[in-house]
Every structure is written in C-alpha cells, then in structure tokens.
C-alpha cells in the first residue's frame, strides 16, 4: 500500500528516536520494532528489555524544569499531528513498550464511491 510521505517520515523519525533512546538510556540486550497494517491503520510497536523508567517522573521533569524527556515528547507530538494514538508503558527494571496507532487516511480523506 502507498503511504503518504508525511506519514512515512513521521514513522521513520519516531522509530529513529525510540531506537536512539534505547541505545542511550535503556541498557537493553534486545529491542523489537514491529509495523503492521490493519484496517487502514498503521500500527507500530517498539519493545525493549532494558532498565525501564518511571514514565511519571519523566513527564513531570519535562513540565517542571524543561529538561529531559524531549524524545518522548516529540514522538507524542508527531503521532498526535497525524491524529494517532500513542501509549508508552515502562517501569524500572521491566523494559519499555511503545504502541502507536496512526490512521493511513487522514481527516478529510476517503475513498470515492
């Protein structure tokens, strides 16, 4: 299926940021990136078996002092600009799971007929 260049670029940047974060912060032995196409949606899953983190502390740090967490913030922003959803699940010692769902037909688009 043909994917709009704006979606392809956003997905590339999201995966790039996630893999960079895994490399820099996770101390992971394994990482998995999985992309599926289901019912006019792109589903992106990124998993690692690294050290994990407290998502609330990272979110609070972004808001309180403006440092840290910008990679997660930019991934969220890219997904939201495409009317998608993102779930980031992580706990210290349990690795990280990122699940993203992006509609391939953006608002106002559709099939004729």
Located regions from the model:
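Coiled-coil dimerization/phosphotransfer module
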Residues: 1-113
């Amino acid at each position: 299926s043909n994917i709009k260049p704006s979606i392809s670029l956003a997905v590339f940047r999201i995966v790039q940021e996630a893999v960079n974060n895994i490399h820099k912060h996770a101390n992971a032995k394994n990482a998995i990136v999985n992309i599926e196409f289901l019912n006019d949606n792109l589903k992106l899953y990124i998993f690692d078996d690294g050290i994990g983190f407290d998502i609330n502390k990272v979110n609070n740090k972004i808001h309180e002092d403006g440092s840290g967490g910008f990679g997660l913030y930019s991934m969220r922003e890219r997904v939201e600009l495409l009317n998608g959803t993102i779930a980031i699940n992580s706990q210290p010692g349990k690795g990280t799971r990122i699940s993203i769902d992006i509609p391939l037909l953006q608002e106002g688009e559709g099939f004729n007929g």
